[in-house]
Every structure is written in structure tokens, then in C-alpha cells.
Amino acid sequence: LKSLTVLAESPVESRELLTELGVEKVIVEGKTAARVTQGDSDKPKQVPPNQEGKEEAPVATAAQPKEPAEQPDAKEGPAEGQQPGGVDNAAEASPAAVSPSRPQPAESEVGNSSPGEKGSDAPSTEARGMELEGKEEEGEAMVEDEEEAKIPKAAQPKSESKENAEDNESGSTDSGQENSGETRLLRSGTYSDRTESKAYAAVTHKCEDCGKEFTHTGNFKRHIRIHTGEKPFSCRECNKAFSDPAACKAHEKTHSPLKPYGCEECGKSYRLISLLNLHKKRHTGEAKYRCDDCGKLFTTSGNLKRHQLVHSGEKPYQCDYCGRSFSDPTSKMRHLETHDTDKEHKCPHCDKKFNQVGNLKAHLKIHIADGPLKCRECGNEFTTSGNLKRHLRIHSGEKPYVCVHCQRQFADPGALQAHVPIHTGEKPCQCLICGKAFTQASSLIAHVRHDTGEKPYVCERCGKRFVQSSQLANHIRHHDNIRPHKCTVCNKAFVNVGDLSKHIIIHTGEKPFLCDKCGRGFNRVDNLRSHVKTVHQGKAGMKILEPEDGSELNIVTVASDDMVTLATEALAATAVTQLTVVPVAAAVTADETEALKAEITKAVKQVQEADPNTQILYACDSCGEKFLDATSLAQHVRIHTAQALVMFQADTDFYQQYGAAAATWQTEQVIPATELLFRPRDSPQEAPAAPLAPVPLAGEGQAPAE
């Protein structure tokens, strides 16, 4: 203790004494700390707040009275920086402590201190000596404690980093230091620097049901809802439930008719900005996913994969009710609504029913007066811009969708899609009861209900029942006398566009409904059905000619010198013995149909006058189809715009008049099966044998040849 009391009287002796005590490191580091402190004295010193109850400032304050007490002369300035107790004081000392040439404060200034401070000098010195003796026994532990007491805060990076780490764990941030670029240790033992540490990626969540792993807890929770079926998020408009909040938010926007996100290139609007961004890629050329079959571009690989199912024909999504398959799940969901007859949501304006409240709300936009989606031509209103565009094509006559098989044009893509199976023969919808197949599911449903007698759609005004909801909707328009579709030629109005299309055919003369048996055209499909039932199924007095006793049919013809003869396989298969043609104009128009009918009738009368018992059969010289009356043949010839062939069956007496000559003419004119015979128009026709002279046309005043 005596050695420590006179420690500051001689710097050399102090150094030697402390070396013997094993605390030389304190002296050396004290100098270094003093020099560092003196060099930084001009800069503002950052004094961090006291943390965790550490009172470091009172230690430096208590060391201040030691210097005057131990050095009464106060003339050796550099020795102050070497004293263990004056290191902290040197950083805040007067300029005399920095420069040894300047005088130190007088002893009287020290005497101005309070008596309590003077009285604390002796206890402080004794405590210091006892502390050094304890540290001498503990070795380096004393050195670390002295460093913490003497080194300024700016020179303690380790302690500061520990304190900052504690602050970061508690959520606070030290304003004096920023730990950007440093790796912080979190409570979980992982590192916050995701790019430098692999511990973050190693933390995964594994699904026990399917084994899928996730690195984010939120994604893992959303995935779990797939297995549990939990849907905690519901729409505020229709109460539809969702398992994901983003999907719920996107769904709620569908209830709003507003589409605030518009494309600057084409003006198309979208409800979601994500859909707009995908649309813009088509203009910028960023749609990099190209179909190898048709060259169409897509913005996402998912859309490309769904599109490729069209070319491959793969339809993995199958309806559980009718067995119809679809290439995407959205089409299947729309199809399933056709099987759902429980439509509890009813429109208060037009009595139309829906199976979902969202569809009802979309329908209610039709009844909004002066709505944004209103046709300027007829005033009809629509819920979507797509439906309005398709409707406007009715007024403009635009038909951008063309069938690749027959080049027929359509205004609606759905109509084209329903038309294509006519050429391909595809009928995916098959009745499980009778096996009959249909091209559309709606036709199958109507067929099943027709067999069962089910008519679930009832008109509340008159009680009439219907098989399909569209039939009921059209029926209700008749009650309300709503006829929005008007003919531009005669201004006649119709309830639906289908009736208008049927009416327009009257003005154009078009007969698009053709009979596949005889080729006759009709302007209405119901007329075609009536024709097939009455003509081609043995009804309405149709004469079916059959040979008696196994003999072949004998045919007598009416001929002309300037006609074209065209025999086909169909004619050859009927065991014909003789054939010629009736004179008809080369091209038959709609106005010339009656004239053609009159010409054929005259030729028939001429033959009937010769033999009243003759049975008559009419046939087309272009395709060989046979008919029962002149009207049917005249209508059919319009399809080919060619000549008409009239075939007659004569009785046995007629052929007996010609004897062997008839057999000779027969061998010359019989057409073998599967052989086609063409004669050019301007080539002279070979005259038959003399006994079989052609019968002249009626009206020329000549009797049949005998």
C-alpha cells in the first residue's frame, strides 16, 4: 500500500514497481489510451447512455480528486497521462493536460472542491490498493477490468457490438451507430443476413399430408388449408369463402363494374393491374411463349400449356353427370351449371333465376336505366362488354369467325364451335339410356328431359312448362311483348335474334337447311324435319316402287335433242334399263322454279296420255336422287343448277309394242354399276333405235310414237 501511495512521485520508479507487481500492461495501455484520447480531444465525443445499470461516469469523476492529492506540486503534466487513475480525466482535462508547456491548474483550484470530495481521497486510494492486490491474485482478470474502466467508449468496439446486439434483440436501434452490412445474431440462432448464411434456407416447414416443403410460414399455412378445406376469408358481397386472402380480394373486385386500369395502346380496361400488365406484354412483344403448332404467343407458360391441349385433343377434366370432357377446369365449372336446376336466386324484374347470387347481381345490370353497356341501335343492355360486342355484330353484319371446313362465317365464336362438329362428326355427349349422341351438352339435356317428360321451367303467368331455361326466357318476352330485334328490310320485330335470322332468309332467298337424302333446301329447320318425315320415311302417300315377281324396273323416258345426260352410281344401282332427259334450262334460279315445274309436268302428261297406268318416278341427272313429284325435283335442281331427269315406269303392254327392238335399245343404253357417263352440252346426242323414237314434249301437238 505504501508503494502505491507514492506511485506518482517518480514515473521511472512507478513503472519498475508496477512491473514487479505484474501490471505493466496497464501502464503501457494507459499511455496508449491517453494518446488516443488526446488525439481525439478536438472531436465531439459520443457518450452513449448508461445501459444495464453500469455507472461508468462516476468512476471517472471519483478519480479526479486523486491527481491533486497525489501530486501536490502539479508540475509534471506528462506524468498525469501515465497514472492509472487519471486516464479518463485526461480526455476531459484542460489544455494544460494536453500540452506540458502550459501550467496546470493551481492548487487553490483543487481546494475549491467540496470537503466531501477531499475526504474521499484516502478511501479511494485504499480501495485502489485492495483492488490491485485482488487483481494480482486473479491475474489477467484485473487487466480486463482496468481496460473497461480506462479505455474510452470510442475505443471499445467489442462492448458496443454486444450492447447493440442486445438492443436489436429487443427491437430498438442505436441512433449513434448503424449496423448495415453486419450480420446480426437473432434469438432463434439463425442469422439475419440471408445472402451470407445458409441457416435461413435450412429452416423449412414440411406438410405431413403430401410432403411438400416451404420456407415461409405464411405459404405453409395457406397450403395446409388445401388439405383441411378451411376457408376463413369470405366475400363481403356474396359471402363466397376463400382459403387465400388475395383470392378473396380479387373476387370482391368482380362485383364492381369499374375497370380503372386501361391500356394506353388499345384502350382495353381491366379490374386488376396484374391483368393489365399481362395484356401489355402483347404490345411490347414480351409474350415469349409460342405455340409450335399455330404460332400463337402467350405471356405465361401456364396459358401456353392450356392452349396446347386444344391441339393435342387432351381433355382431362370430365363431367361426372354426362361424361363430357374438357381441356380446362374453367370450362368444366361452367358446364356443371347446366346440370344444376336448383336456381333459388330470382330476378325481381324478369323472373329469371340463377344458381349463384353473383350471377344474379351481374344480370341485374341489364335492368339499370341508361346503363354503360347499352346498344345504341336497339337499346338492348348487357352485363359485359364482350356480350355487347357480339351483339353489335348483328347490326353490322360482321362475321369474323370462319369455318375451316366449309368457309361459313359466324359472328360468335360459340356458334362456330357448335358448328364444327357437323364436319368432324364428333358427338361427345351420349345418352346413357338410348345411346344417342349429341354435339352439345344442352342438346343431350333436352333429349333426356324429353324422354323422361321432365319440364322443370314453368311460366308463372300462364303455367306453361319448358324443357330449357332459354325457352322459358323467350316465352316470357312474348308476354311482355319485348321485341328488340327488328328486320332492316320490312321493319318487322322479333323476340330473339334466332327468329330474326330465320325471317331474313325470306328476303335473301337463301335455303341453308339441306336434306341429306335428296338435297332439297329449306329456309327453316322445322320445314326440313317435316320433309324428312313425310318424304323419306314412307309417309304422306309416298309411292315406293318395287319390282313384281323379282323382275327389274323398266323405265321409259321423255327425250330432247339438245340436252345433257349425266348418269351416276346412284342411278346405275337402281337397275335402270333406259334413260334420257327432259329439256330444262342450264341454270335454274328461284324465279324459274315454277317454269321448270311446268315443263316437267307437261312431259309427264304426255307419257300419261299414252299409258294412264304408268307409274312415275323423278330423278336428278346430277346426283341421281329420286323424287315423287315435280315440285320436289324442281326445288332440288336449284342446288346443282343443271338439268332435270324424269324417269317413268311403264307397264308390260308398253314394251310389248316394241318387241325385240326394245331389247336392242336396252342393251345399248344400260349403264353398268360404278360407271359415270358424261356428255358435253354441245355434242350431238345419239338417236335411239327407230322403233324407240323419242316421245316429243307435250304441247307440240304430237302423239306418242307407236
Swiss-Prot record:
GO biological process: negative regulation of transcription by RNA polymerase II; regulation of cytokine production; regulation of immune system process
Domain BTB: 1-12
Low complexity composition bias: residue spans: 90-106, 687-698
Biased composition (Acidic residues): 134-148
Source domain of life: Eukaryota
Pfam families: zf-C2H2, zf-C2H2_11
SUPFAM superfamilies: beta-beta-alpha zinc fingers
Main location: nucleus
Compositional bias per record (Polar residues), positions renumbered to this chain: 170-182
Function: Transcription factor that can function as an activator or repressor depending on its binding partners, and by targeting negative regulators of cell cycle progression. Plays a critical role in early lymphocyte development, where it is essential to prevent apoptosis in lymphoid precursors, allowing them to survive in response to IL7 and undergo proper lineage commitment. Has been shown to bind to the promoters of adenovirus major late protein and cyclin D1 and activate transcription. Required for early embryonic development during gastrulation. Represses RB1 transcription.
Protein name (database record): Zinc finger and BTB domain-containing protein 17
